[in-house]
Amino acid sequence: MKISVIPEQVAETLDAENHFIVREVFDVHLSDQGFELSTRSVSPYRKDYISDDDSDEDSACYGAFIDQELVGKIELNSTWNDLASIEHIVVSHTHRGKGVAHSLIEFAKKWALSRQLLGIRLETQTNNVPACNLYAKCGFTLGGIDLFTYKTRPQVSNETAMYWYWFSGAQDDA
C-alpha cells in the first residue's frame, strides 16, 4: 500500500463512504481505575459523518492507494500542545477490515514523530465501537469523555465524544 499527500478535491471522493452501521454502543462508567467501557447491542442504524468544509491551513490530507485506487484517507494537523490531531480517517467500504485504517494510523504516528510532536489525539463517539477497538489495538488510550459535545445537535445528541491519545515513547503516559 502506498500513502501519499492528496489534494482536498481528491479526498472528497471518499466523503460518500464516511458512514457505518451501528450495531453496538459503549456505555461509559467511571471507576477508581478510570473509564470502564461495556458494550450494549442496539437496533442497527446508519451513522453518517457530516463533512465540515472549514479547511485548516495547518492540515495535510493523505490518501491510501492499492493498485492506484484510492481506498482510504487521513487528515492530520499539528496542535498547540505538541500533538498531531487526526481530524478525519475514512476507508472505502470495500476495503474496511483489511488493514487500511491500521496503516493510516501507523503513517500518522510516523508523521507526528517526523515533526517532533509528542503524540496524537483524535475524537470519536461511543457508537463507533469498531474504530475504538482499532485505536486501542494501535496503542491509543482513552483519555477523556465529553457528555455534552453533541447535546446541541438533535441528530447526534445521544452520542458521547471519546478522546483517544497515543504518546511516543519519549512522553510519559497520561
UniProtKB/Swiss-Prot annotation:
Pfam families, per the entry: Acetyltransf_1
EC number: 2.3.-.-
Reaction(s) the record says it catalyses: streptothricin F + acetyl-CoA = N(beta)-acetylstreptothricin F + CoA + H(+)
Domain N-acetyltransferase: residue ranges: 20-170
PROSITE patterns listed in its UniProt record: GNAT
InterPro entries per record: Acyl_CoA_acyltransferase, Bact_Acetyltransf, GNAT_dom, Streptothricin_AcTrfase
An individual GO BP term: response to antibiotic
Gene3D superfamilies to which the protein is assigned, alphabetical: 3.40.630.30
GO molecular function: acyltransferase activity, transferring groups other than amino-acyl groups
EC top class named in words: transferase
Family from the record: Belongs to the acetyltransferase family. GNAT subfamily.
Function recorded in the entry: Involved in resistance to streptothricin, a broad-spectrum antibiotic produced by streptomycetes. Detoxifies streptothricin via acetylation of the beta amino group of the first beta-lysyl moiety of streptothricin.
NCBIfam families the record matches: sat2
The protein's name in its UniProt record: Streptothricin acetyltransferase
Gene name of this polypeptide: sat-1
